[in-house]
């Protein structure tokens, strides 16, 4: 919230505990005139992205999801980990352990060097959002 405030963005929070809460939470956000919605990676939200999109699309509010799957089922865009690359990177670490080159306890924590931009172009077009050419080169 503090970082968003430095960028002139006011964060409005909504909490859901189960799929049945999605419609009410989304409607409340729409009624507060939010300009966009961000959804973190969450199984409840992931299973209800189509429901969320139905409400937000009608209000022309874009949803930015935390992962590719959620983006393709109701979001507009995301910068997220590439799960294939993450698995590959984990496999390399496991290979070191299996080959006796390292002990699990001694392996450093690794993060992905590159993240993946995924855009749901159909939804962006539906909402009247133009994807800048500068971003198109990074799209997957």
Locate each region found by the language model.
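Short hydrophobic alpha-helices and adjacent helix-cap/hinge residues
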Residues: 1-140
